[in-house]
Amino acid sequence: MKIIAIASPAGGVGKTTLAHAISVAAAEFGKKTLLIDLDPAGSLTFRLGFENPRFTITDYLTGKSLSSENLDSTSERFAFIPADSRLTTELAIDSLSAFLKELPEPFDLIVLDTAPSLTQSLKLALSVADHIFTPVDTSLHSLRALLQLRAMTDVAVTAITSGEVIIKECSPALDVALIRSSEMDGLIKGNLSILTTDKSGDVAESYRSATYSILEILGLE
């Protein structure tokens, strides 16, 4: 089992879209994947249609036992655990690690979507991740967030760039750049990723290629 955090202290850089797309692509590649929303705002939870979940990651981090019956599944073939606003409270730093060790079934890959700020839930994610991936575009805003993230942890942080320009300071960066499109929001329909709604499009293929590179880094190819 490998754990990755999709993290950036900057907002608006495509972090949640990336976490969702990686989970879909990993499932397409035959990897049993669990996606966990660790953002108190619950952007991913709402995107996937879990507006009023019965149980959330906060419940499991504060003592609720997770069973296979309580584990939400999606039409895109990955398992999902939603978030709620209680993630803003102080949680024991070892609570996520303990929870992941007691999962009711084995997973090849666990993807953690994190808050776009320096929250306790981000610290939890960094404490358990085998590798951290952060989306970076050509803006100074996202580059600063990358450097800030690298200063926070000893875990390897790899940039995933988008656009034509790869900033030197991003290194190490994934060998595949994401294609971003102004039409992307229109292609994400309902609770489905662009990998489902525009399966053979260039944008979807770029996310698929990035995910395969991630699996190679993790030794899961």
Stretches with model-predicted labels:
Residues 104-121:
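Glycine-rich phosphate-binding loop used to anchor ATP phosphates in small-molecule kinases
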Residues 121-139:
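Inter-motif core of Ras-like GTPase G domains
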Residues 2-40:
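Walker A/P-loop phosphate-binding motif and the immediately C-terminal alpha-helix
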Residues 160-198, 207, 213, 217:
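Beta-strand-loop-alpha "switch" segments that mediate conformational coupling across diverse proteins
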Residues 1-3, 160-162, 221:
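Acidic-aromatic/histidine active-site loop/patch
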Residues 28, 32-105, 189:
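P-loop/Walker-type NTP enzyme "switch/lid" segment
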